[in-house]
Amino acid sequence: MDWLTKYWWILVLVFLVGVLLNVIKDLKRIDHKKFLANKPELPPHRDFNDKWDDEDDWPKKDQPKK
């Protein structure tokens, strides 16, 4: 078990290389042209800031000062 305390980082590197190889293998399986041909339409962006903007507390420029 002495070797494990000295060379634990090699096991971590082997694990990371295995993860990287599996990711590359899975990404090669994806057909991006087929996905782009059949991609769903995105719904319009809903912005709820319009209600917040109506409650503006800044003074209007054309109003006289009180």
UniProtKB/Swiss-Prot annotation:
TM regions (residue ranges): 4-24
Protein's name in the database: UPF0370 protein YpfN
Record region (Disordered): 39-66
Topology in membrane: Single-pass membrane protein
Highest taxon of the lineage: Bacteria
GO terms for cellular component: plasma membrane
Family from the record: Belongs to the UPF0370 family.
Subcellular location field: Cell membrane
NCBIfam families named among the record's database cross-references: PRK13664.1
Disulfide pairings: none
Basic and acidic residues composition bias: residue spans: 42-51
Taxonomic classification: Bacteria, Pseudomonadati, Pseudomonadota, Gammaproteobacteria, Enterobacterales
Keywords per UniProt: Cell membrane, Membrane, Transmembrane, Transmembrane helix
A Pfam family recorded for this sequence: UPF0370
Predominant subcellular localization, coarse grouping: membrane
